[in-house]
Amino acid sequence: MEPVGYVLKVAQQSLRLAMDTAMRDLGVTAPQYAVLGFLDESPGMSGADLARRAFVTPQTMNRIIFNLDEAGMIERAPHAKSGRALNTRLSPAGRRLLRRCRERVDAVENTMLSGLTAAEREQLRDLLQCCVDSLQA
C-alpha cells in the first residue's frame, strides 16, 4: 500500500494533467486558470499575493500575469497606496474565459470523483481539510 502523501501527489499531478488537457484548446494552463479564479474571488490582488496563493515563485507569477495581460484577460493598474505595486483584475474577456474554463474543470472534477457517492465526496473533502489543518497548526 502506497503512503497517503504519495497518493495525494499522484492525484494532484493527474488532476493537473487532466485540467491542462481539458483547457488546452482555450490556451489556458492550470496555473493560469487558478489566477483567473483568484482574481474573480479577490479583484485587485498584487502579483506577490497571487504568487503566494498559487504556490509559485514571484518570477513564475510575473510570467503568468504577463501572458494573461498580453492575451487581454486581465487589466492592471497602479496600487492606490503604493504607486509601485500593480493591482490586477479580470477583464470582461477574462471573465468569459473563466466561465468556459470552469465548465471544463468541473467536468474533470466530476470524472475524478465519479466513483464516489455524494456523501463520500463530502467526507473526502472534510478529511483532506483535516489533513491541511493538522499540517498548518
Language-model regions, residue ranges each:
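N-terminal leader segment of winged-helix/HTH proteins
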Residues: 1-26
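Short alpha-helical elements of helix-turn-helix
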Residues: 2-6, 26-37, 62
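Short, locally clustered residues in the helix-turn-helix/winged-helix DNA-binding domain
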Residues: 9-12, 37-41, 102, 129
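Charged, amphipathic alpha-helical coiled-coil/dimerization segments
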Residues: 16, 66-129, 136
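Residues within the alpha-helical elements of helix-turn-helix
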Residues: 38, 53, 71
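Short capping segments at the starts of secondary-structure elements
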Residues: 42-46
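Residues within helix-turn-helix
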Residues: 47-48, 59, 66, 86
